[in-house]
Amino acid sequence: MRCPNCNSLDTQVKDSRPTEDSSVIRRRRVCIACNFRFTTFERVQLRELTVIKRNGRRVPFDRDKLVRSLQISLRKRPVEPERVEQMVSAIVRELESGGEADISSETIGEIVMDHLRKLDDVAYVRFASVYRNFREAKDFEAVLGELSGEEEARPALVRK
């Protein structure tokens, strides 16, 4: 592994441990040349995914882009970073195990929205407003109506 500080290839792993859900290995490393310490993460990649954009262009799937878009949707929301990481891992696993190496951006967006709907309603609406390209207030009303309908269908919690 190349040192991000001095570009030396002479680094040593000091500590390795799985994350809480065991989907990632976290490694603490030290550069032998400059003593710089850094962390790397190792994930299983089942297949190389390609995203087919709305304009037909093909680009490699970027997990970090998914993380950034979720962080924007979840900004100032009471959601722990660990939950976000678990959700991202679940989304990527779902995409990789789908059997197709080429995935449309629409499919990715729908999967993300399904996961966000379960995690945080506000983040779901924020993501939907960008993903579905909302132009008017009625677009928001429609999504809020969907969420309200789901809330009515769920049994209410009785508090004593």
Swiss-Prot record:
Keywords: ATP-binding, DNA-binding, Metal-binding, Nucleotide-binding, Repressor, Transcription, Transcription regulation, Zinc, Zinc-finger. GO terms for molecular function: ATP binding; DNA binding; zinc ion binding. One of its GO terms (biological process) is negative regulation of DNA-templated transcription. It holds the Pfam family Zn_ribbon_NrdR. InterPro entries: ATP-cone_dom, NrdR-like_N, RNR_NrdR-like. Its cofactor is Zn(2+). The keyword ATP-binding applies. A zinc finger (unnamed) spans 3-34. It comes from the Bacteria. Negatively regulates transcription of bacterial ribonucleotide reductase nrd genes and operons by binding to NrdR-boxes. Belongs to the NrdR family. This is Transcriptional repressor NrdR. It comes from Rhodopseudomonas palustris (strain HaA2). The lineage of its organism: Bacteria, Pseudomonadati, Pseudomonadota, Alphaproteobacteria, Hyphomicrobiales.
